[in-house]
Amino acid sequence: MSAERFTASGWPHSEVLTGSLRSGGRGNTMFVGNIPRQFVLRHYRRGGLLGKIVRDSYVFTGEDLTRSFKEWRLLDKLATNNMNVPRPAAARFYRRGTFYTADLITVRIPDVIPLSQYIAKKDRGEAFWRSVGQAIWKFHEAGVYHADMNAYNVQVDKDGDIWMLDFDKGSLKSPGPWQQETLGRLHRSLVKVLGLDPKLHFHAANWEELLEGYFDASKSA
């Protein structure tokens, strides 16, 4: 794929993702291309306090260790195994001496919205929350570590199926404490968005339903 495709100007149509559509907020993300064949272009950016100082540069330690190439390889493996993740289309890095910047292009998943937006529309029943837990277990059973599982990166399609976005710093791991830590991160994110919008349809019982779905799936594995 040509270098110009990694910029908004390299596409006839582009739409910057803003607000609740943004997955985690660390990337500069936009839709590019024409429906029905659209892509998501993401420029890697740092988060947190460091991101205010060094916006999008990373120390170069080898081509295979660049953020974009690592995420591309992980997504390719997961998509090949029919996991509900974006299918990777292209990745690149641009080296400047000791540092580099990176970009990733994935195929856009049609008709998905963030979990935070999905539960803002109306109260979702027990079956839905159990399905979220079951979907998370499917990833954990496959050893998939998601570094930033939150109410934005967990997405829901028009059929109510669960998808995962943003596998930056993700990896494949053996079972361990990281599985519970991932669940804890998602719970904190849901509590946080509830604090931002008290009308959100998320209650303690919903989290218990999610956990029931997760652990029931793990027992039947």
Give the location of each predicted region.
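Conserved ATP-binding subdomain of kinase catalytic cores across diverse folds
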Residues: 7-113, 137, 141
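Short beta-strand micro-motifs enriched in acidic
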Residues: 94, 157-159
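Generic detector of well-ordered alpha-helical packing
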Residues: 108, 149, 167-169
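AlphaC helix of the protein kinase catalytic domain
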Residues: 114-123
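Conserved alphaE helix
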Residues: 124-135
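Residue immediately N-terminal to the catalytic "proton-acceptor" Asp
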Residues: 142, 147-149
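Hydrophobic residue at the +6 position relative to the catalytic HRD Asp in the kinase catalytic loop
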Residues: 149-156
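C-lobe/activation-segment region of protein kinase-like
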Residues: 159-221
